[in-house]
Amino acid sequence: METLDKIKKQISENPILIYMKGSPKFPSCGFSARAVEALMHCKVPFGYVDILQHPDIRAELPAYANWPTFPQLWVDGELVGGCDIILEMFQQGELQTLLADVAAKYPQE
């Protein structure tokens, strides 16, 4: 599978998805750690891709997303943004509402 197809598949199969360095339990950079902490406070299920384990995705996603840095939060197929945007939305209560609405649209089996 081509890298771009893999990215599109990941985004379509995960209503809430973060591309990050490391994992939610063991983030490998401060930006990823802060972003995933905000997501975890929202108490909704989310997927993640560790870009350190997937150099092809790390190389191609910035061009596809037109967003140069990581982490990247994708919600319902749309790029929300990186760490600063995630934290700003969380502090304003917008992230919690967005994620709760999307999680309700896609109940876990």
Curated annotation (Swiss-Prot):
Highest taxon listed in the record's lineage: Bacteria
Disulfide bonds: none
SUPFAM superfamilies in the record: Thioredoxin-like
Sequence positions that bind [2Fe-2S] cluster: 29
Primary localization class, coarse: cytoplasm
Keywords for this protein: 2Fe-2S, Cytoplasm, Iron, Iron-sulfur, Metal-binding, Redox-active center
Locations listed in the record: Cytoplasm
Annotated positions binding glutathione: 21, 58, 70, 83-84
Domain Glutaredoxin, first and last residues per copy: 4-106
Gene Ontology terms: cellular component: cytoplasm
Molecular function GO terms recorded: 2 iron, 2 sulfur cluster binding; disulfide oxidoreductase activity; metal ion binding
InterPro entries in the cross-refs: Glutaredoxin, GRX_PICOT-like, Monothiol_GRX, Monothiol_GRX-rel, Thioredoxin-like_sf
Function of the protein: Monothiol glutaredoxin involved in the biogenesis of iron-sulfur clusters.
Self-association state and partner proteins as the record states: Homodimer.
Family note: Belongs to the glutaredoxin family. Monothiol subfamily.
Name of this chain's protein: Glutaredoxin 4
Gene source species: Pasteurella multocida (strain Pm70)
Lineage: Bacteria, Pseudomonadati, Pseudomonadota, Gammaproteobacteria, Pasteurellales
Gene name, Swiss-Prot/TrEMBL: grxD
